[in-house]
From Swiss-Prot:
Belongs to the TRAFAC class myosin-kinesin ATPase superfamily. Kinesin family. Kinesin subfamily. Keywords: ATP-binding, Coiled coil, Cytoplasm, Cytoskeleton, Microtubule, Motor protein, Nucleotide-binding. This is Kinesin heavy chain. One of its GO terms (biological process) is microtubule-based movement. One of its GO terms (cellular component) is cytoplasm. Composed of three structural domains: a large globular N-terminal domain which is responsible for the motor activity of kinesin (it hydrolyzes ATP and binds microtubule), a central alpha-helical coiled coil domain that mediates the heavy chain dimerization; and a small globular C-terminal domain which interacts with other proteins (such as the kinesin light chains), vesicles and membranous organelles. Residues 399-408 have a biased composition (Polar residues). The keyword Hydrolase does not apply. It is found in: Cytoplasm, Cytoskeleton. The keyword Coiled coil applies. PROSITE patterns: KINESIN_MOTOR_1 (PS00411), KINESIN_MOTOR_2 (PS50067).
Length: 880
């Protein structure tokens, strides 16, 4: 039964991308089976079995295009439904839909499944059905089982009984619609999809869902089977629009290549001239070999875009559909006859054989007569075999039952040349063909195995390359880290050695500092002892000072007692003078009253004045007789000499106990103090001289006043009754008051001078005592000078000897330190030389290994050695 491929065209509405581009629909629907494309670069009218517009429903597509195909499958025919079109044209939507549970959104495949099980449920009970399904995809020209995704490179085989099939493909027996849906979901989840600029979920492979239905009549034993291929082709892609790159670009190349092979097969099937159909150029065309010009009833759904944005792709799709519509298939029922039918056919064949044998014998006799040259009358000719002609006609009109085979040779032998292109003209025997198919299957298995091995090897190679790249990067990083760590280790090693060397030097310096510390400790102990001695001396000096103050107090008391300046005596003298003054006043009043003054009164007044004069003279003698100027000068000189001796002794003591810097500082301070003391003493002596002169003048003045008073008394007594005026009395009283004030001032000065005199006497006594001690210790002044000279020489020699000893000790210490530093430096040089030698050996090894010189690091090592070494004559920075 010859039939053409049914071609159905479906247009989808414009999508978001086309609207954003400002495109407009360019398709017109002239009739239910005709559409016209009107665009600048593409135009034409196309006629198909049916054309569905942009508002068509899924149910409309199924009812017209697919429902008869389901009935054919149940009658034992093979069927194929596949969708073709550019990417994003709606192929997957047409085949699968959006939702299996939504009646409006379900696609062709779910509706076919529902129709199959509905037909099975409505069939007679004498027929048994078996339904099995399989799901595969062709991704990157490799057949992958979607129900077992680990099987990603299955081979294609061809056998006499089974035809073309995929070896190793999992077939699942199903008994309900839901089980088929589960298989569809399971396979759909494993299918490869990706996002492009044309489609958010673009199929990157051709998917093929196969439904095989086997039915058997339990009463007659007859059986027949049908196989339905539901193909969702990946869309053709234009890279400029999809923006494919990387892996997506490689997938697009493989998709376009397989679609080009499909187009070549269709072209060769429809041109009527090709002697070879290139089914084996692509695995897609190889699997669909029976669907394209073989034992199958095929429906092609072409999906198109109505937009001007994709006008060129739409034109190409419509032309593809027109070419496919010209393909003629010869479908036949895949049936197995029952034993009764086979017996009837056998009896019929045997009767035909008997008839044919009789007819052949008649024809052979007639032929022999003709060969002998005899003529056979026309009425004796063998008549045509009417039964044979009728049988041939009946056989031609009735489809002959056969085994379920889709072998290409049988279908092609029965297909007229006008309907499809011829197969290769080389005749092949049945045995040779079976051997050829067997050999082809073996080679196909080997090819598949080799492809699997190649794929595994390529994967291993990629993994190895990635691992090698990673290892190279890691090795480079490790080498850099190793070099860095090596340089750091060398640096740390050099720093460690430098620190060890510095530690040795520090130890040497520490030893020298310890020795210096010991010496300073000894000197400190000595100074402490000297300080203790000085404190003891200070205590003795304090005691001596207390004794001195005591003696001073005693001498002051003794001296003041000599002056008879006690309170009682002084009061009596004052009373005497006051009585004299009162007596003079009374005489003055008596004289003023005009009374006569007795001479006895004048004698008594004269005696009292003489007594007063004696008291004044006694005070003058006590003050000036005990301390003359010469004695004071002599005593001052002795005290100054004694002070110089004490200062010299003190300086000697400081020189023995202090260093040169301290001695110089103390000398400077003493010189300043001595000069200040000298200046103070000179000023004090000058002040004393001035005061003595002043007091002498005052005494002379008092003498003059006293003489004046005596003269007045005498003159008063001579006048005997002549009273002086009131002014004279007042003058005498004023003079007496002034005398009283002067007397008090003189007494204060006298007491101060007595204190100074006592101090000088005490100092003089101490100086005399020391002088006597010195005289007792030395026979004469010459011997004393000689001893002083010898002592100074001895001190100088001792000082020089001490300096020499100190210099010798310091030099010995410096020599020892220098020797230890020299030993440490030699060890350091030896270690650096060994390090340099090791570095040179390592650099030589690395140079031979990597093929490039590394001598610049030797310069670095030399530079490091030069930086780490320093002159041998450097002295330690320590205090000797």
């Amino acid at each position: 039964m010859s039939n053409s491929i049914k071609v159905v065209c479906r247009f989808r509405p414009q999508n978001r991308i086309e609207n954003e581009q400002g495109a407009q629909p360019v398709v017109k629907f002239e009739a239910d089976d005709t559409c016209a494309l009107d665009s600048n670069g593409a135009a034409g009218s196309f006629t198909f079995d049916r054309v569905f517009g942009m508002s068509s429903r899924q149910k409309d597509i199924f009812d017209f295009s697919i429902k008869p195909t389901v009935d054919d499958i149940l009658n034992g025919y093979n069927g194929t439904v596949f969708a073709y079109g550019q990417t994003g044209a709606g192929k997957s939507y047409t085949m699968m839909g959006t939702n299996l549970d939504n009646d409006d959104g379900r696609g062709v495949i779910p509706r076919i499944v529902e129709q199959i099980f509905a037909s099975i449920l409505s069939s007679p009970g004498t027929i048994e059905y078996t339904v099995r399904v399989s799901y595969m995809e062709i991704y990157m020209e490799r057949i992958r089982d979607l129900l077992q995704p680990q099987n990603d490179n299955l081979p294609i085989h061809e056998e006499k009984n089974r035809g073309v099939y995929v070896k190793g493909l999992l077939e699942v027996y199903v008994s309900s619609v839901q089980e088929v849906y589960e298989v569809l979901k399971r396979g759909g989840d494993a299918r490869v999809v990706a996002s492009t600029n044309m489609n958010a979920e673009s199929s990157r492979s051709h998917s093929i869902f196969v439904i095989t239905i086997t039915q058997k009549n339990v009463e007659t034993g007859s059986a027949k089977s049908g196989q339905l291929f539901l193909v969702d082709l990946a869309g053709s892609e234009k890279v400029g629009k999809t923006g494919a790159s990387g892996q997506t670009l490689e997938e697009a190349k493989k998709i376009n290549k397989s679609l080009s092979a499909l187009g070549m097969v269709i072209n060769n099937l429809t041109d009527g001239k090709s002697s070879h159909i290139p089914y084996r150029d692509s695995k897609l065309t190889r699997i669909l070999q029976e669907s394209l010009g073989g034992n199958s009833r095929t429906t092609l759904i072409i999906n198109c875009s109505p937009s001007s944005y994709n006008a060129e792709e739409t034109l190409s799709t419509l032309r593809f559909g027109m070419r496919a519509k010209a393909i003629k298939n010869k479908a036949k029922v895949n049936a197995e006859l029952s034993p009764a039918e086979l017996k009837a056919l056998l009896r019929k064949a045997q009767s035909q054989v008997t008839t044919f044998e009789t007819y052949v014998s008649t024809l052979e006799g007639e032929v022999q007569l003709w060969r002998k040259g005899e003529s056979v009358p026309k009425e004796q000719w063998a008549p045509p075999l009417a039964g044979v002609s009728g049988a041939k006609a009946a056989a031609a009109q009735t489809p002959r039952p056969s085994t379920p085979s889709r072998l290409a040779t049988e279908s092609r032998a029965e297909t007229p040349v006008a309907e499809r292109s011829a197969t290769p003209g080389i005749p092949i025997d049945k045995d040779e063909r079976e051997e050829f198919l067997r050999r082809e299957n073996e080679l196909q298995d080997q090819i598949t195995e080799k492809e699997t091995q190649i794929a595994a090897a390529e994967k291993t190679l990629r993994d190895t390359k990635e691992e090698l790249t990673y290892l190279k990067e890691r090795d480079t990083k490790v080498n850099k880290d190793n070099e860095k760590l090596t340089s750091e280790a060398n640096e740390f090693k050099m720093q460690l050695e430098r620190l060890a060397f510095e530690s040795k030097e520090a130890q040497i310096t520490m030893d020298s500092l310890k020795e210096a510390n010991a010496e300073l400790t000894a000197e400190l102990d000595e100074l402490k002892q000297q300080l203790l001695n000085v404190k003891m001396s200070a205590k003795e000096s304090t005691a001596a000072l207390d004794e001195k103050e005591k003696r001073k107090a005693e001498k002051m008391a003794q001296m003041m007692a000599g002056f008879d300046l006690g309170g009682d005596v002084f009061s009596e003298n004052e009373a005497t003078i006051k009585k004299v003054i009162d007596h003079i006043d009374s005489l003055h009043e008596q004289s003023s009253a005009g009374e006569a003054i007795p001479p006895d009164e004048f004698e008594e007044l004269k005696a009292k004045l003489v007594e007063t004069q004696g008291i004044v003279r006694q005070a003058e003698l006590s003050m000036f007789g005990s301390s003359s100027n010469d004695a004071n000068v002599k005593r001052r000189e002795e005290l100054e000499q004694r002070l110089q001796v004490l200062e010299q002794e003190y300086e000697d003591l400081l020189e023995r106990n202090l260093g040169e810097g301290d001695v110089a500082e103390i000398k400077e301070r003493l010189e300043k103090a001595y000069s200040n003391n000298q200046d103070i003493k000179v000023e004090l002596v000058e002040d004393l001289k001035k005061e003595v002169a002043q007091k002498s003048a005052e005494i002379e003045k008092f003498k003059a006043v006293n003489e004046d008073l005596q003269q007045r008394v005498k003159s008063g007594s001579a006048s005997n009754g002549t009273a002086p005026g009131s002014a004279s009395g007042k003058t005498v009283q004023q003079q007496i008051a002034e005398f009283d004030v002067m007397k008090k001032s003189l007494m204060r000065d006298l007491q101060n001078r007595c204190e100074r005199v006592v101090e000088l006497e005490i100092s003089l006594d101490e100086t005399r005592e020391q002088y006597n001690n010195v005289l007792r210790s030395s026979n004469n002044r010459a011997q004393q000078k000689k001893m002083a000279f010898l002592e100074r020489n001895l001190e100088q020699l001792t000082h020089v000897q001490r300096q020499l000893v100190e210099q010798n000790g310091s030099l010995k210490k410096e020599v020892a330190i220098a020797e230890r530093k020299l030993i440490a430096r030699n060890e350091r040089i030896q270690s650096l030389e060994s390090l340099l030698q090791d570095s040179q050996e390592k650099l030589t090894t690395a140079s031979h290994r990597y093929g490039f010189p590394l001598y610049f690091r030797i310069d670095f090592n030399h530079t490091s050695i030069a930086l780490l070494t320093f002159p041998l004559d450097s002295k330690p920075n320590c205090q000797q």
